[in-house]
A protein has these predicted regions:
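Long, positively charged, glycine-interspersed low-complexity recognition regions
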Residues: 139-141
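Helical "substrate-binding/catalytic lid" subdomain
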Residues: 7-136
Length: 141
């Protein structure tokens, strides 16, 4: 597809990848909520399979998710860390340059950072601050 002058195609692809970050994050969070509702004993893979056929959220990303949910051993063997290859960062940078709000893409990128333990120090400080001002409990490492 020809988008326009030099660089416009790369720009469009960058935005595509930023949208992908947000969509992936929403799908993963939704299935985490399904998994977390233990009293319903929901079959996440079966729900995802139903959504693949005629649901408004049907997509290739949902197909990949359902495939992953169907292999519990493989899913359990994966560390809960998500890399980024730069496109999300570039999209967020562009949003800042334009002054255009892009909270979903930004939070999806931040979630990837947090998955790598980059927030551990900040979270420890938050816990200690809460204990300091309100006597809230902290969980020991």
């Amino acid at each position: 597809m020809h988008c326009g002058p030099a660089g416009s195609g790369h720009f469009a692809k960058m935005i595509h990848n930023g949208i992908e970050y947000g969509m992936m994050q929403a799908i993963a969070e939704g299935f985490a909520l399904i998994q977390g509702k233990a009293e319903f004993a929901l079959d996440a893979a079966a729900i995802g399979e139903a959504w693949r056929h005629g649901s408004v959220v049907r997509s290739w990303l949902l197909d990949l998710t359902v495939d992953a949910l169907g292999d519990a051993d493989a899913l359990a063997a994966i560390a809960p860390q998500v890399a980024d290859s730069g496109e999300g960062r570039w999209t967020v940078d562009e949003a800042v340059r334009q002054g255009t709000p892009a909270p979903v893409i930004t939070l999806a990128l931040m979630s990837r950072f947090a998955s790598r333990g980059n927030a551990d120090h900040a979270n420890r400080l938050l816990a200690l601050m809460r204990r300091g001002f309100g006597g809230h409990t902290v969980v020991r490492a």
